[in-house]
Amino acid sequence: MLADKIRHYQEEKKMLKNTPAGYKKEYPWLKEVDSLALANVQLNLEGAFRKFFREPGVGFPHYKSKKHSRKSYTTNMVNGNICLQDRFLKLPKMQPVKIKLHRMIPEGWKLKSVTVSREPSGKYFASLLFDCENQTAEKRQAEKFLGMDFAMHGMCVFSTGERAGYPMFYRNAEKKLAREQRKLSRCEKGSRNYQKQKKKVALYHEKIKNQRKDFQHKLSYSLAEDYDAVCVEDLNLKGIAGGLHFGKGIQDNGYGQFLSMLGYKLEERGKYLIKVDRYFASSKICSVCGHKKKELTLSERIYLCECGNRMDRDVNAAVNILKEGKRIYKKCA
């Protein structure tokens, strides 16, 4: 489908409207595949082209890597073709598969679609999408505010003076992971030992990812429970990672993922995630007297002001973000 779309675009400069049904005669094995899964692939492909036509900067749709792309497919619930019962999941053109259910499904929820994915470690996951009533609470009056500033070490610092204390899971496991990756590089590609070692490396990465997500879920839950509004900087994390060569550190603490978790947890409770403009000089302004320094290098970890204020620069920035967040809230309210 993509090859035909590319060819048609090169000739006509338009998107070809082709469907999976038109290829089943030429490729009979497509009849063995769930037709709704093929339809979802078609929708994803058309969406990629529409986005390209709207925003050429995103790039022309291209072929996905066979080795490194995410292995998944999505199917839809139509006329009871998907069944979830007694710890078994029945998908179209498949026998019922025993599953470990993450949580019980409330009554009244309607199953809409299922996305099945395979992790590099060989584990399979099914993400179930349900249609339900709006679970978001009504917005409440914010009384308890918290300022939060991004930090390379510990993930973030709060206006209370506390640090998140993120354990840097990837950094701690880096030596062990490097040793296992060296073993993998010495194995003959495609051999049984290569596959075993590849799975072992994938399990290390999966463990690090799960540790990170567990820490972030617990912290974001705690903040969403304790505060009515959390004020953060709207940072360009990709720019920081590339421009300041902090890529590995930022990817390790997963600050962007943490903000996403915190955002939806606050929204579910009718609370607020207030984003302060990224160009707001939170680090240069004194949180006590309001004086703004002309220059402040990254090596200066203590903020010193002529008024006598002596404070950790990250805590000082978090207090300034808190004040600016309160101002934005009052203005919008």
Which residues does each PLM region occupy?
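Nucleic-acid substrate recognition interfaces
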Residues: 1-333
